[in-house]
Amino acid sequence: MDRFELRRLDYSLSDDHVALQNAYRQFFKTHCSIETVRAAEPSGFDKSLWERLCAMGATTMALPESCGGDGATLVDLTLVAEEIGRSLAPVPWIDHVCAARLLGRLGALDADTAGLANGEQLAALDARIDCVRGARLIPTGSIADHIIVRDGDQVVRLAFGTRPAKVDNIGRLPMAWVDPAAADSRTVIAEGSDALANYQRALDEWRLLTAAALVGLVEETMTIAAEFAKTRYTLGVPISTLQAISHPLANMAIAVQGGRNLARRAAWFLDNEPDERPELAPSAFVFMAEEAAKAATMAVHIQGGLGVSAEAAATAYLVRARGWPLAGGDPGATALRVAEIVAARENAPQPA
């Protein structure tokens, strides 16, 4: 892909991008069936799937070459995230790579965290926009070896001798309450404005990749609903020909394409011109957080009584469409951040 294509609103993928996405799509199709997803729900994590994913290089690709990684771009990472969402893969890849990339930027990938690059150790971060003190819900807190949080103007790495207990959550994530004061190990890895700016970058990347995952989720739930509608008849015609079915499906397709384009554009700017359009990554997240819930709900409605059964794949997609965005706190806080960025830019003094 030409370096400036996404800046020019050309969202086509190169042959390498297509090959990358196809490789991960085939991987999850082979190793992550809906039965695998269901089996992992008690813990929110499939260790075997994670090890297979790491063996493909999914964690090392996200790190720069200076940190022993493969130097993948954020556009590359959105393609992997999309396939994770499509398959509902019970792996903490998004949280892990965002935390590992943050540690890399802060020069904190040391001997204690040597296992992060290849996924032997797991990293988590507090994905909330607002900085809170005391205990907070961490999306992958029950399985992480290292938990990265803000504490005032410090970025700290926490470790627990006994991992925090998983709490039930609608997104079926390995979520846990984490109190920095209760950690067995607390290491300050950076402090000051630069440290907080780098943490904000990690939050933007988390929202970007979560948005991309929701794109894949919506596309798959749309496919499930469409296949159902093509095989069910009423009055001698497939229900897919009825406007009450076909129009919502078309709206899902529009949401998928719009969210995908927005995520890829946000990824390009975050990589190449991060100060030019900082609102794009949180905008992609806010858009997909809303659209994913609406699309997954409609997919359940299209399937009627079958769709609301606990065994239906559509139900698995619905709860995650609603739950995954909440892992970063109230999506409204992200919408407020978008508004603040745009307002600050519009109200900035213009050069004479």
Predicted regions, residues:
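FAD-binding core of flavoproteins
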Residues: 88-94, 101-227, 352
